[in-house]
């Protein structure tokens, strides 16, 4: 008797992806974040869908509709805070997932890696537009500042900004289109995730040693399904602790004040997960230069496969590169801190040094260290 799981046209796709998939026997907890990102995406889509049922994308009623969700809708407060803090969990998992790829050399699967970078851009765009929707002070001024950056593009900049705004300032038209894009982008992201997985399953997973693991594979189910469920339960635990005990921990108090175009908040800053890029943007005193640095701070990830000069794939057996990698992590934490500080001495100079170090480590120091390590091993 033939097994439906292996013969049914639709079920066999699921089978080859999540059940009978040959997986390396030694992948660590760092490989859990892919499935956790999938879980985050599902949580965000469902909570977002229920929020959209009660939200109105009009400048006059947007702020009130969010208040209405929190006060009058059954468990509306829970859905709203799960969605807001779910975004934070999403980005924590994203950063750890990308960091894992950098550390273990997963970027050598360059189709998978490049689609991952595009996914990162898309999730960042989605999160930015979502932050505008509650129409608080930080929503309005964040949208104004970030969209205004496009005016730095020569010739077409001003026209482009006014086209995105749908007028001469951030207003009703901007809010409506941001809501539309915020709704559609997660579904496009989901489609891209499938392409990401398609390319990953062409090559199979990498593993901590960076060596080919074809000779030692185990089925995904039950080994990694159980492992992923454990990760998922821990993620939900952390998310719910955040939501139920301190839902506003990662938010900005300014966003509890309705948007007012006539009063600028003293410190305009984005959500915590954009602060590292915001710090890089602010560290360059030229508008166009800042915008380019901002874009390249993420786009630089696409260069990783080209900058890999080591004869080994993973950093597991490369102590010098490991050391530099953790300095890079510390640098990104420093940038995140600086992004939330006012533009004054000594924060300006710290931000500039941290930005220079960020690009120097990736473009210059890590490749150089890789060559030194090759020489030390007489390769």
Curated annotation (Swiss-Prot):
Pfam families: Cytochrom_B_C, Cytochrome_B. The chain crosses the membrane at residues 33-53, 77-98, 113-133, 178-198, 226-246, 288-308, 320-340, 347-367. One of its GO terms (cellular component) is respiratory chain complex III. GO terms for biological process: mitochondrial electron transport, ubiquinol to cytochrome c. Heme b b566 binds at residues 97, 196. Binds 2 heme b groups non-covalently. This is Cytochrome b. The lineage of its organism: Eukaryota, Metazoa, Chordata, Craniata, Vertebrata. The gene is MT-CYB.
